[in-house]
């Protein structure tokens, strides 16, 4: 089973924003990635992380079962059809996710506490610190 952990963050929301994701197979990290977006909201950053992870998985793990873990209850609830997507910008991200989902056998989205998403969160902060402070 493939587990994907994604996270996004925005300092001062909206503010400087970044994304990160970690892909694990049998609890071993096989890929991790993060990047700076620019000025954006936290939700845009969260969805950017999800899309970046889905795109990487489509290129490298097509036709597999994917379990996604996110610490944003809003995003998980929107992807699982519990909450409606009202924002037009966010709707574009949901449509992109829906276009990528058929590349996989099965895909699930599960909400987890922030403390269980530390690796993806660290990539977000690393990308922000690197852009803002050069560290």
How would you describe each model-predicted region?
Residues 9-13, 51-135:
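RNase H catalytic domain
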């Amino acid at each position: 089973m493939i587990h994907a952990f994604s996270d996004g963050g925005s300092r001062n929301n909206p503010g400087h924003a970044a994304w990160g994701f970690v892909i694990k197979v049998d609890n071993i990290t096989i890929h991790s990635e993060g990047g700076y977006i620019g000025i954006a909201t936290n939700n845009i950053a969260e969805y950017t992380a999800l899309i970046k992870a889905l795109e990487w998985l489509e290129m490298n793990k097509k036709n597999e079962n994917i379990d996604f873990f996110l610490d944003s209850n809003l995003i998980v609830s929107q992807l699982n059809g519990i909450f409606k997507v009202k924002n037009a910008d966010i709707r574009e991200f949901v449509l992109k996710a829906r276009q990528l989902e058929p590349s996989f056998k099965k895909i699930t989205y599960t909400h987890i506490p922030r403390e269980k998403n530390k690796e993806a969160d660290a990539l977000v902060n690393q990308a922000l610190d690197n852009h803002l402070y050069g560290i």
